[in-house]
């Protein structure tokens, strides 16, 4: 799996969709996946706070694998690599896998 990380507006979603098409693999934009689960991101953060957003966003990432979507390319949310280590029980493992390219 290829995970695209970077700041908002960097082109992760655009490049991710093109790359997935070229490789003929599924593409998931984590922000869109999150919004499909719980609604508008800004409203969610305003209502529940950033820590809750981080926890739910990590859960959305984990759900990709439970739901057997298993994308070939995933565009991560802009702050995904900056969450607190205790944001979610799986976050430490996920972050290490991303950093190590697993």
What are these model-derived regions, one by one?
Residues 43-85:
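Conserved nucleotide-sensing/catalytic segment adjacent to the nucleotide-binding pocket
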Residues 77-102:
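ATP-dependent NMP and nucleoside kinases share a basic, alpha-helical "lid"
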